């Protein structure tokens, strides 16, 4: 599996023109980051153990191919901070929510704002979060949905790249 560079991540996320495709891509990127992180959990690199135990666990049909199961394992082993676990779980849950909707909300919708307001890698960046809040709750004469949507997309992109940096083994 090829390692994603930050430029690859930025290009893939920037190419998405709606929230659904953005979150689908973000979910896929985060799952790939977790898959790349998982082998670092196994301390014994004995060839036989890797071949008969580790590889089947990490296979695409294996139990650790599920982002939620893999996250729980990483967190339970103490290899991930609570805020990071919460952020990735939150991204996964929001993606599953969007996947079940008949009509997908947009970047500027209130449900997306609620999602953003609970992503630690966004809310901990005071400058970014304060700018988003100021624009979200600005006077309608100043507020532009297209501008706000672009800013939300940027914030979510930064959240994904921040999360991936934390997943470096």
From Swiss-Prot:
SUPFAM superfamilies from the UniProt entry: MtlR-like
Gene3D superfamilies for the chain: Nucleotidyltransferases domain 2
Molecular functions (GO terms): fumarate hydratase activity
E.C. numbers: 4.2.1.2
Group of enzyme by EC: lyase
Catalytic activity entry: (S)-malate = fumarate + H2O
Keywords associated with the record: Lyase
Key word Lyase present: yes
PANTHER family in alphabetical order: FUMARASE E-RELATED (PTHR37941:SF1)
Subunit-level organization: Homodimer.
Function summary: In vitro catalyzes the addition of water to fumarate, forming malate. Cannot catalyze the reverse reaction. Cannot use the cis-isomer maleate as substrate.
NCBIfam families in the record: PRK10022.1
Protein name: Fumarase E
